[in-house]
């Protein structure tokens, strides 16, 4: 019954699972740890919250410290799926982002993405980021869809049609510039309101947003802690499962 304590920063692998039967206090323990990190360190915390469990904690810690992003179809909170920080990915950031967009289109279009579609997506993604660099305006999925419509190939127009629902349609929360503050020390991604149709895409965009924040903090020499409540949810989606 002796208490075993350790500093995760000194371990080879700092990942951890909180396991227990329902009602045993897993989420409470996670909240307690988050509060400790915020009050005693300069680290940042990102939370993926499928059951609307962490909003109250964020509110208690204050608007200067925490923000809750409510992801839901038709909601006012939006995340730019094509946002990319300097140093994104491990190699060429445009190539890395192009692969992410391919995964995103595969989630949207269950028919899959063949070699020709991949070539078109790769080309258009590069063109969109070239335009963004020239104009200083962040690239968005709407820009990508417009660029696809400009291409001569019929398959490009098919991809654009697949993106329509997520850019100008009713599920457009990932198609425009972000409307949320991602710079707070605690960012809670509340995905409770995502329907089954939007959840796979939402998880993919959120994992990419997490990658952006971790990359940015790493360049600053700042630690980032990622908490995933109901972790099995991310494994219901192949791409988010691969990420974690």
What does each model-identified segment do?
Residues 3, 52-66, 73-244:
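P-loop NTPase motor domains
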Residues 1-71, 244:
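Glycine-rich phosphate-binding loop of nucleotide-binding enzymes
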């Amino acid at each position: 019954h002796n208490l075993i304590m350790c500093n995760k920063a000194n371990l080879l692998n700092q990942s951890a699972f909180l396991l227990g039967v329902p009602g045993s206090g897993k989420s409470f323990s996670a909240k307690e740890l988050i509060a400790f990190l915020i009050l005693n360190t300069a680290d940042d915390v990102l939370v993926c919250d499928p059951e609307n469990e962490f909003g109250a904690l964020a509110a208690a810690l204050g608007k200067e410290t925490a923000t809750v992003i409510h992801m839901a179809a038709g909601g006012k909170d939006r995340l730019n799926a094509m946002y990319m920080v300097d140093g994104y990915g491990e190699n060429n950031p445009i190539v890395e982002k192009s692969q992410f967009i391919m995964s995103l289109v595969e989630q949207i279009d269950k028919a899959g993405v063949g070699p020709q579609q991949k070539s078109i997506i790769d080309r258009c993604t590069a063109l969109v980021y070239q335009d963004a660099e020239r104009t200083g305006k962040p690239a968005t999925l709407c820009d990508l869809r417009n660029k696809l419509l400009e291409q001569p190939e019929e398959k490009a127009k098919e991809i654009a049609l697949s993106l329509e629902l997520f850019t100008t349609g009713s599920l457009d929360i990932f198609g425009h510039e972000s409307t949320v503050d991602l710079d707070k020390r605690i960012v809670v991604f509340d995905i409770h309101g995502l329907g089954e149709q939007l959840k796979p895409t939402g998880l993919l965009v959120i994992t990419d947003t997490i990658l952006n924040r971790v990359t940015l903090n790493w360049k600053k020499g700042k630690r980032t802690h990622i908490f995933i409540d109901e972790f099995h949810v991310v494994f219901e989606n192949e791409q988010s499962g691969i990420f974690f």
